[in-house]
């Protein structure tokens, strides 16, 4: 199952948290879910070059808090905050006038973010860079930045071949079955003249130890 299930979904509630954090009754659930989808799609389309990895959404009554994780906060914020203000007004229009608050968080090491790595490989494939070169360079950067393991996979008409195929490379460890293993996963698509090429990335950053156990050990040391 470790090869089939989404690495983040497999770890939700254990070491990973939900990207949408709110509760709704049966009547409102569908509406809120569609709103979340529209918010994420609009932000990704408008700020595709800003290196946005994750968009978290929290709700309270008529207020929505949107947390944007980006490698280039300057592009999102804009000059004197004009970019954030324009984005906030657009999102309020999408959600039917609900109060939107935006929180921009910088990704300190984009080389260790699986989504950004996948998007970077996809962007290079669109520029006709060799898929092997793009994958190996991305893996080398991740390992230099402190990753304990990385796996990249591309699927499609690689190099313009008549028959689609899948190729992958792996360096280090990727313990998919270990729930405490902090594995980041990303997916992107490259739109080439030959069709779409799917890019998947797994990055292993180390184990996340439970906080309760750590607290108990400290108490025992005293």
Swiss-Prot record:
State whether keyword Disulfide bond applies.
Answer: no
Cellular component aspect of the GO annotation: cytosolic small ribosomal subunit
Against CDD domains, the record matches this protein to: KH-II_30S_S3
**SUPFAM superfamilies reported in the protein's UniProt record:** Prokaryotic type KH domain (KH-domain type II) (SSF54814), Ribosomal protein S3 C-terminal domain (SSF54821)
Q: Does the keyword Ribonucleoprotein apply?
A: yes
| Parts of the chain that traverse the membrane | none
Q: Which GO terms describe its molecular function?
A: mRNA binding; rRNA binding; structural constituent of ribosome
Q: What Gene Ontology terms for biological process does this UniProt record contain?
A: translation
InterPro entries, per this entry?
KH_dom (IPR004087), KH_dom-like_a/b (IPR015946), KH_dom_type_2 (IPR004044), KH_sf_prok-type (IPR009019), Ribosomal_S3_C_sf (IPR036419), Ribosomal_uS3_bac-typ (IPR005704), Ribosomal_uS3_C (IPR001351), Ribosomal_uS3_CS (IPR018280)
Q: Which residues form a coiled coil?
A: none
Residue limits of the KH type-2 domain? 39-108
Note the superkingdom of the native organism: Bacteria
Key words of the record: Ribonucleoprotein, Ribosomal protein, RNA-binding, rRNA-binding
State the function annotated in the UniProt record: Binds the lower part of the 30S subunit head. Binds mRNA in the 70S ribosome, positioning it for translation.
Q: Which HAMAP family match?
A: Ribosomal_uS3_B
Q: Which PANTHER family match?
A: 30S/40S RIBOSOMAL PROTEIN S3, SMALL RIBOSOMAL SUBUNIT PROTEIN US3C
What the record says about family reads:
Belongs to the universal ribosomal protein uS3 family.
Q: Subunit details for this protein? A: Part of the 30S ribosomal subunit. Forms a tight complex with proteins S10 and S14.
Name of the protein: Small ribosomal subunit protein uS3
Q: What is the lineage of its organism?
A: Bacteria, Bacillati, Bacillota, Bacillota incertae sedis, Caldicellulosiruptorales
């Amino acid at each position: 199952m470790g090869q089939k299930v989404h690495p983040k979904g497999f770890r939700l509630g254990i070491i990973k948290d939900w990207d949408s954090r709110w509760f709704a009754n049966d009547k409102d659930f569908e509406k809120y879910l569609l709103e979340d989808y529209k918010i994420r799609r609009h932000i990704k389309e408008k700020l595709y070059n800003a290196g946005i990895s994750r968009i978290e959404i929290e709700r309270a009554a008529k207020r929505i808090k949107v947390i944007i994780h980006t490698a280039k906060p300057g592009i999102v914020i804009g000059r004197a905050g004009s970019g954030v203000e324009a984005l906030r007004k657009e999102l309020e229009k999408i959600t039917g006038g609900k109060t939107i608050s935006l929180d921009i968080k910088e990704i300190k090491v984009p080389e260790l973010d699986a989504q950004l790595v996948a998007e970077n490989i996809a962007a290079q494939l669109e520029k006709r860079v060799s898929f092997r070169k793009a994958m190996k360079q991305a893996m080398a950067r991740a390992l230099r930045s402190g990753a304990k393991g990385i796996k990249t996979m591309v699927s499609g008409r690689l190099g313009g071949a008549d028959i689609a195929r899948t190729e992958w490379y792996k360096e280090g460890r990727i313990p998919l079955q270990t729930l405490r293993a902090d594995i980041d996963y990303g997916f992107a698509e490259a739109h080439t003249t030959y069709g779409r090429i799917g890019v998947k990335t797994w990055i292993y950053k180390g184990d996340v130890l439970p906080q309760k156990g750590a607290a108990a050990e400290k108490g025992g040391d005293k």
